[in-house]
Swiss-Prot record:
InterPro entries: ATP_synth_asu-like_sf, ATP_synth_asu_C, ATP_synth_asu_C_sf, ATP_synth_F1_a_nt-bd_dom, ATP_synth_F1_asu, ATPase_a/bsu_AS, ATPase_F1/V1/A1_a/bsu_N, ATPase_F1/V1/A1_a/bsu_N_sf. Keywords: ATP synthesis, ATP-binding, Cell membrane, CF(1), Hydrogen ion transport, Ion transport, Membrane, Nucleotide-binding, Translocase, Transport. It catalyses: ATP + H2O + 4 H(+)(in) = ADP + phosphate + 5 H(+)(out). Produces ATP from ADP in the presence of a proton gradient across the membrane. The alpha chain is a regulatory subunit. It is found in: Cell membrane. Pfam families: ATP-synt_ab, ATP-synt_ab_C, ATP-synt_ab_N. This is ATP synthase subunit alpha. The lineage of its organism: Bacteria, Bacillati, Chloroflexota, Chloroflexia, Chloroflexales.
């Protein structure tokens, strides 16, 4: 039988006390006075600051803490949006302020993963290994730290790379009605970044879970997940999580822009982020604002809905060499209703971004895919974001397509056209056919240049309009197999100010003539 001695009691006391932190701590504690619809009204948190995280500690029936963000600071109460399920939070529950703002894990460990807006993995591949966290909200880089956009982001889509080029550090809006191929353009761009030294982030806001799973499956199929991070806030998530999702994705992108990650043994400091889509993001923020009883404005959106998107998109930048030379390129997506680009959210985002890719339902239904309306689409960075080779061949293309649009409109009302006008219209139709491209089949820059050179130098004038896409596919297959040296020559000289150099011109024209001599498309 063991006897309890004074020495044993002393040891027990020592053991218990040594495991307890007896230092005094000041904690700002309050209580929940009302909760519902993802919003909690709190009393007693007199030291909380705007956007601070508040914690609802574990209690009977709830083993984990639930967190929220304090957004409305009123005279006698604080309103906080709850990040997660609010069903276990009740009136009278304790709540504490944490002194922190919301942060997410960033860095190497996120590559190839699917996470929620809090940076927690949802792909079943285990915990994420990370070394640091970053606040999701941050002031955009200043004017002094930036550099002008001069390096292209090759989308692999010939119509975009030739007519509406996107540069590293640019914000290019993808806008159009539902089911016009907006996500397809973004996913094609991500797939084309393989081997280009670019990390991609895809932020899904308010989408169906099946749709997000389909996107992830597509990226895995084409080997793009190894350099991609997917941030998912689906339609089943709370409006609060949908609201913070793009900011979380942007913080992950900023880490890459500033400090870089290792990709295939190289340090990569260029990131591309897709926000799909900001229309649903604005709706989620409207829901949060109305629940917080903020006064509604136009279309019931709160007064700061412009600032909601401007502070997000301004964080995309190209840094100068003194600050690391990294870049964050943003491709926000906006869904319009019945082609109405003059609605509130579309006009807001158009005015914030550096151009827009406008996809039209009528063109999509007519078989023009990508359904790019060249007339309304624009890139404010322009040819500064193109290689010299693409600039040389695309310059003529823009003018000829503009001329074709004018003549096509005129031809609708004219019964008899002269031969020159007919030839110009047919030429425009050929060029338009050339810009059609199947999904998930991005073209390398040397292939785009070769095809556009042939088109703008009258080598396609004897090919029937219906055979143009077949001609393009066969010609590129011929170049890859019979003349890979021509493709290499174009790629090696793509930055030459005098493109096409006599050497490139001679080799390319010889290859085109050889192909025309061995094929028949009449």
């Amino acid at each position: 039988m063991t006897t309890i001695t004074e020495e044993l009691i002393a040891r027990l006391k020592q053991g218990i006390i040594s495991g307890v932190d007896l230092q005094p701590r000041q904690v700002n504690v309050g209580t929940v006075i009302a909760v519902g619809d993802g919003v909690a009204r709190l009393s007693g948190l007199d030291q909380v600051v705007a956007s601070e995280i508040v914690e609802f500690p574990p209690k009977a029936g709830r083993n984990e803490s639930i967190y929220g963000i304090a957004l409305n600071l009123e005279q006698d109460s604080v309103a906080a949006i709850i990040l997660g399920d609010d069903e276990s939070i009740e009136e009278g529950d304790l709540v504490t302020s944490t002194g922190r703002v919301i942060s997410v894990p960033v860095g190497q460990g996120l590559l190839g993963r699917v996470v929620n807006p809090l940076g927690q993995p949802i792909d079943g591949k285990g915990p994420i290994q990370y070394e640091k966290m970053r606040p999701i909200e941050r002031i955009a880089p200043g004017v002094i730290t930036r550099k002008s956009v001069d390096t292209p982001v090759q989308t692999g889509i010939i119509a975009i790379d030739a007519l509406i080029p996107i540069g590293r550090g640019q914000r290019e809006l993808i806008i159009g009605d539902r089911q016009t191929g907006k996500t397809a353009v973004a996913i094609d761009t991500i797939i084309n970044q393989k081997g280009q030294g670019m990390v991609c982030i895809y932020v899904a806001i308010g989408q169906r879970r099946a749709q997000v799973a389909q996107v992830v499956g597509t990226l895995e199929k084409y080997g793009a997940m190894e350099y991609t991070i997917v941030v998912s806030a689906t339609a089943s998530e709370s409006a609060a999580l949908q609201y913070i999702a793009p900011y979380a994705g942007c913080a992950m992108g900023e880490e890459i822009m500033e400090n870089g990650v290792m990709l295939n043994g190289q340090l990569v400091k260029d990131a591309l982020i897709v926000y799909d889509d900001l229309s649903k993001h604005a709706v989620a923020y409207r829901q949060v604002s109305l629940l917080l009883r903020r006064p509604p404005g136009r279309e019931a959106y709160p007064g700061d809905v412009f600032y909601l998107h401007s502070r997000l998109l301004e964080r995309a930048a190209r840094l100068n060499e003194e600050y690391g030379g990294g870049s964050l390129t943003a491709l926000p997506v906006i869904e319009t209703q019945a082609n109405d680009v003059s609605a509130y959210i579309p006009t807001n985002v158009i005015s914030i971004t550096d151009g827009q890719i406008y996809l039209e339902a009528d063109l999509f239904n007519a078989g023009q895919r990508p359904a790019l309306n060249v007339g309304i689409s624009v890139s404010r960075v322009g040819s500064a974001a193109q290689t010299r080779a693409m600039r040389a061949v695309a310059g003529k293309l823009k003018g000829e397509l503009a001329q074709f649009r004018d003549l096509a409109a005129f031809a609708q009302f004219a019964s008899d056209l002269d031969a020159t006008t007919k030839a110009q219209i047919e030429r425009g139709q050929r060029l338009q056919e050339l810009l059609k491209q199947p999904q998930f089949q991005p073209l390398a820059v040397e292939d785009q240049v070769a095809v556009l050179y042939a088109a703008t130098n009258n080598y396609l004038d004897d090919v029937p309009v219906a055979m143009i896409t077949k001609w393009r596919d066969d010609f590129l297959a011929f170049l890859r197999t019979a003349h890979p040296e021509v493709r290499k020559l174009i790629y090696d000289n793509r930055l030459d100010r005098k493109f096409p150099t006599p050497e490139v011109k001679e080799a390319l024209e010889a290859a085109i003539k050889e192909f025309k001599a061995t094929s028949n498309y009449s």
